[in-house]
Amino acid sequence: MERVASIMYLYPGNKEEYKKRHDELWPEMKEALKAHGAANYSIFLDEKTDTLFAYVEVEDKAIYDKIAETEICQKWWKYMAPIMKSNPNNSPVAVDLKEVFYLA
């Protein structure tokens, strides 16, 4: 398993809505994540800065990255774009993080 971490950014005032939307994550989106090898996926929020920290374990990063090509993922991005910083294709603005420590 590969460990993948990134940060994303909420627009101010959207903490509750972001949590609500993820509490109600579409079953099709859950299935797509799992089908692309995602496991142990967590997202944390720094409430002072509206910064999100995402962590996911993936079987193969190249396979996981292909989720971006799916219709359900693109629909999810469009749904989330009004409440978080997004790219022109509606994907969230994300900064991949480099792992600097790991304790097994």
Curated annotation (Swiss-Prot):
Superkingdom as given in the UniProt entry: Bacteria
Protein family: Belongs to the rhamnose mutarotase family.
Known partners and oligomeric status: Homodimer.
Catalysed reactions listed for this entry: alpha-L-rhamnose = beta-L-rhamnose
Active-site positions on this chain: H22
Cell compartment(s), UniProt: Cytoplasm
Residues the record lists as binding substrate: Y18, Y41, W76, W77
HAMAP family: L_rham_rotase (MF_01663)
Function: Involved in the anomeric conversion of L-rhamnose.
Top-level EC class as recorded in UniProt: isomerase
Biological process according to GO: rhamnose catabolic process
Keywords assigned by UniProt, alphabetized: Carbohydrate metabolism, Cytoplasm, Isomerase, Rhamnose metabolism
The name this protein goes by in its record: L-rhamnose mutarotase
InterPro entries in the record: Dimeric_a/b-barrel, L-rhamnose_mutarotase, Rham/fucose_mutarotase
Gene that this polypeptide is encoded by: rhaM
Species for this entry: Listeria monocytogenes serovar 1/2a (strain ATCC BAA-679 / EGD-e)
GO molecular-function terms, A-Z: L-rhamnose mutarotase activity; racemase and epimerase activity, acting on carbohydrates and derivatives
The protein's Enzyme Commission number: 5.1.3.32
Protein's pathway: Carbohydrate metabolism; L-rhamnose metabolism
Pfam families: rhaM
GO cellular component, as recorded: cytoplasm
